[in-house]
Swiss-Prot record:
Pfam families: Glyco_hydro_9. Glycans are attached at residues 259, 464, 484. One of its GO terms (molecular function) is cellulase activity. Residues 1-26 form the signal peptide. Its EC number is 3.2.1.4. It comes from Arabidopsis thaliana. This is Endoglucanase 10. The keyword Signal applies.
């Protein structure tokens, strides 16, 4: 009786083991089959990490990067999160009976330059549209939208009629000789505008791009505001296109600060965003018909506040990834092919890899504000990689050599990691991140104690101080190292140690793409 019972127990366990093994084999087979069907056997693979896994490193950096926009705000501050900032620029625009008090100060000074500010808004919008879910996962979507709206509120008021756009508040000749807190400014802040007599195509078109992209961001949450933005975008694009002329030529004073090298890229950029916002084929025809004239097909360029071609090429590539009815468009195909050439130039092991790279791996193009091209390139690479993975395209060919889509993402991470401290200097270039970061940032508000009252000139005692800034400009991405990977942390070094809003907008986009398992929506609408 006892032997029989033992025998039956042994048989039961044996059968259970067989069944369990069969189930495991079936699961493994199913996973392999699904992987093969999805194309992962081609070596592309999905984005690493389990769905929804948050990378704390990038999440912490993202929160800081967005905080920098609060530091740069002008106007009457609502829900002020920065203890050493207060209301400023409240009378901006009053000489022409306008309220231009909002907007952002451009960098470490107190000028509101409309051209880079609009670009900041466009990039912020793009980042939110593509990676809003990732931002939301770490509670940063609302801060991003708040900062965007602070800019677009300003841009709306800077465009009081169809063919008039105020593009600057303040005069660098008056502002730059001063070193004071924005709250203490008493100098005159004259206005600069473009109109039919003094056109500025690049600024009008960039502002149109900002308005069009932002209209998509607010389409669901505030349809009325979205419609207002889109109306302004259409008017500004028409103004930019029908009254062509470079603002750098017509207003030569801007050349020393934000000199434009041409307006064709902004026209294509604005038309691309207007197509995404409206699906009006007129705008798609515009980029197809004017590509030969403006797009520099086959010649990779660097994405920046001045040159929007690479961004336009990636944005239009998105249409071919996700809109099958446009797959036969020859005009769009040229944009996508050039976008691929840009990507191949960024991959370190590509036959066409750029030589504009430091020994530590940082994309490096110019001494002044060297981080701009690295952060913009990384942002575009992350986008393109996600477009590929979302549409189940896992390979990119560079002169016959095959690379995985995830290698573009790896490149993007390498640039982000460099900025966050993984570099030969062992320093983070994002203020407040890590144990070692710049202490003497070229930034007036950060360098002067909040309880100090200074005039134009007596604030220079703080500029010349040997003590670190009393206020930390959290999240500011400074200019960056020289090609030989040296860096001087000094207020007297704006070339390397001054932050800008547009660099931070690109950083927000990059970090948002990396903060969790990454993907993009098939439609921006």
């Amino acid at each position: 009786m006892e032997e029989k019972s033992k025998s039956r127990g042994w048989c039961g366990w044996f059968i259970a083991i067989i069944v369990l093994a069969s189930v495991i084999l079936a699961v493994v087979y199913t996973v392999k089959l699904r992987t093969k069907k999805s194309g992962d056997d081609d070596g592309g693979g999905p984005v690493p990490g389990p769905p929804g896994a948050i990378d704390k490193k990038y999440a912490d950096a993202l929160k800081l990067a967005l905080q920098f926009f609060d530091i740069q705000k002008s106007g009457k501050l609502e829900n002020n999160k920065i203890p050493w900032r207060g209301d400023s620029g409240l009378k901006d625009g009053s000489e022409d009976n306008l309220d231009l008090s909002k907007g952002l100060y451009d960098a470490g000074d107190h000028i509101k330059f409309g051209f880079p500010m609009a670009f900041t808004a466009t990039v912020l919008s793009w980042s939110i549209l593509e990676y809003g879910d990732q931002m939301n996962a770490v509670n940063q979507l609302d801060p991003a939208k708040d900062s965007l709206r602070w800019i677009t509120d300003y841009l709306i008021k800077a465009h009081p009629s169809d063919n008039v756009l105020y593009i600057q508040v303040g005069d660098p000749k008056v502002d730059h000789p001063c070193w004071e807190r924005p709250e203490d400014m008493k100098e005159k802040r004259p206005l600069t505008k473009i109109d039919v007599d003094t056109p500025g195509t690049e600024v009008a078109a960039e502002t149109a791009a900002a308005m069009a992209s932002a209209s998509l961001v607010f389409k669901d949450s505030d349809p009325t505001y979205s419609a207002t933005l889109l109306k302004h975008a259409k008017q500004l694009f028409n103004f930019a296109d029908t009254k062509r002329g470079s603002y750098s030529v017509n207003i030569p004073e801007v050349q020393k600060f934000y000199n434009s090298t041409g307006y064709g890229d902004e026209l294509l950029w604005a038309a691309s965003w207007l197509y995404h916002a409206t699906e009006d084929k007129t705008y798609l025809d515009y980029v197809s018909n004017h590509g030969k004239e403006f797009a520099s097909f086959g010649n990779p360029t660097w994405f920046s506040w001045d040159n929007k071609l690479a961004g336009t090429q990636v944005l239009l590539s998105r249409l071919l990834f996700f809109k099958k009815d446009l797959s036969g468009s020859k005009g769009l195909g040229n944009y996508r092919n050039t976008a691929k050439a840009v990507m191949c130039g960024l991959l370190p092991k590509s036959p066409t890899s750029t030589a504009s790279r430091t020994n530590g791996g940082l994309i490096w193009v110019s001494e002044w504000n060297s981080m701009q091209q690295s952060v913009s390139s990384a942002f575009l690479a992350s986008l393109f990689s996600d477009y590929m993975l979302t549409s189940r395209i896992h390979k990119i060919s560079c002169d016959g050599k095959i690379f995985k889509a995830t290698e573009l993402r790896d490149f993007a991470k390498s640039q982000a990691d460099y900025m966050l401290g993984k570099n030969p200097l062992g320093t983070s270039f994002v203020v407040g991140y890590g144990d070692k970061y710049p202490q003497f940032v070229h930034h007036r508000g950060a360098s002067i104690p909040a309880d100090a009252t200074t005039g134009c000139l007596d604030g220079f005692k703080w500029f010349n101080s040997t003590k670190p800034n009393p206020n930390i400009a959290y999240g500011a991405l400074v200019g960056g190292p020289f090609f030989n990977e040296t860096f001087t942390d000094s207020r007297e070094n704006p070339m390397q140690n001054e932050p800008t809003t547009y660099n931070n907008a690109l950083l927000v986009g990059l970090l948002s793409s990396l903060v969790t398992t990454s993907s993009t929506l098939q439609s921006l609408k």
